[in-house]
A protein has these predicted regions:
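Structural alpha-helical scaffold elements that stabilize or flank donor/cofactor-binding regions
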Residues: 130-131, 174-177, 197
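Conserved N-terminal subdomain of the carbohydrate kinase-like
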Residues: 20-29, 50-137, 300-334
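Conserved post-catalytic alpha-helical subdomain immediately downstream of the catalytic base
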Residues: 10, 49, 231-319, 325-333
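Positively charged, low-complexity intrinsically disordered leader regions
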Residues: 1-28
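Histidine-anchored nucleotide/phosphate-binding helix
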Residues: 39-49
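Short beta-strand/loop segments at the ligand-binding rim of alpha/beta enzyme cores
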Residues: 154-163
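Conserved phosphate-donor
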Residues: 180-235
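Short pre-catalytic strand/loop immediately N-terminal to key active-site residues, enriched for Gly-Thr
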Residues: 28-37, 229-241
Length: 334
């Protein structure tokens, strides 16, 4: 079960890359784990498991992939809303020794192509969110006409807007989204492909992998890049999903004070938020899969890290589905 549900916890609506993650571990060939994934899916699931009222919007269809994804989101306390009828994307992570992983979009058993992400949404998306979903935080890692319209609607309701650009094809919508955003986070390795990135008064975070991160926040007169080293992890199992844990930790540190306009100011205060978020991300690297920590240690352990709790916490791992399909694609797309 999720760690807790506080009535005053910020509400988050997440949109963009939503998928079913299939985790195959070389040392455990008999085990296949099925979890909700994609950046938007992971952020919603982490925050939902840690107690935020979380809503995730994405594709839906009658398939085993959809059922497995939906069941996992339910365990994390996430409400799922259908935005359009389409196949749920399926991403296979193959985890090998020494924390090496690779991703494939073909079934490793039969070679069949797996469903991929497509930028297609319902025409009435704006009325759907305005009538049924009230949010304090709007998160997106992919853009479209509909997602931008929903972000604008959220902004009019004074929501905190988060954009994580990673896809160059966001270009037609990116300038408008950057103008709306309160927080923009992206990886150094993808920045060169995002030629439309521009300065703004938002909190800007540039992650650099093992080299740490840089940040600046013009709104609070912090115009120069501030650098922070990474946190050493003694036993790295899998770095997949660490960025999603970092995002979740930052949002918890910034917004659980009850002010979704983020009145944090000053380098020291912001670095404390970022450092605890880095600790959360580093901790997640000790587990297999993007959110493996939730299924092996649990939400209470994550809470203790991000809140820097001194008291000992007992593990409370979430249950998960470990199905023994011999073919990752065919049962999911049939």
């Amino acid at each position: 079960m999720p760690y807790f549900h506080r009535v005053d916890a910020p509400r988050v609506l997440s949109m963009g890359l939503v998928a079913l993650d299939v985790l195959c571990i070389a040392q455990e060939p008999e085990r296949t784990s099925f979890r909700a994934g994609g950046t938007a899916g992971n952020v919603a699931a982490i925050l939902g498991a840690l107690g935020w009222p979380a809503t995730l919007a994405g594709p839906a269809e009658e398939s085993l992939a959809y059922e497995l994804m939906l069941n996992d989101l339910t365990r994390c306390g996430v409400e799922y809303r259908e935005m359009h009828r389409a196949a749920v994307p399926v991403i296979v992570e193959e985890l090998e020794h020494y924390a090496r992983h690779s991703f494939t979009f073909d079934c490793p058993a039969c070679g069949k192509a797996l469903p991929r992400y497509h930028r297609t949404y319902r025409a009435d998306a704006s009325s759907w969110v305005c009538e049924d979903v009230h949010t304090d935080v709007f998160f997106a890692d992919r853009l479209s006409d509909e997602i931008l319209e929903l972000a604008q609607s959220a902004r009019r309701s004074n929501a905190f807007i988060v954009y994580e650009p990673s896809d160059p094809s966001d270009a037609p919508w990116a300038p408008a989204m950057l103008a709306l955003a309160d927080m923009v986070k992206y990886s150094d390795e993808r920045a060169d492909g995002l030629s439309w990135l521009s300065d703004g008064d938002h909190l800007e975070i540039r992650t650099k992998g093992a080299a740490g991160l840089q940040w600046r926040w013009a709104r609070h007169e912090i115009h120069q890049w501030q650098s922070m080293a990474s946190i050493h992890v003694a036993n790295v199992v899998d770095t997949c999903g660490a960025g999603d844990w970092l995002t979740s930790g930052i949002l918890i540190g910034l917004l659980e004070r009850g002010d979704t306009r983020a009145t944090w100011s000053g380098v020291t205060a912001m670095e404390q938020v970022l450092r605890r978020a880095q600790q959360l991300a580093a901790w997640s690297c000790g587990y297999a899969g993007a959110r493996g920590a939730l299924y092996e240690s649990g939400p209470a352990m994550a809470r203790a890290i991000v809140q820097h709790l001194e008291t000992s916490v007992m593990p409370d791992p979430l249950p998960e589905s470990n199905a023994g399909f011999s073919c990752a694609a065919c049962p999911m797309t049939s």
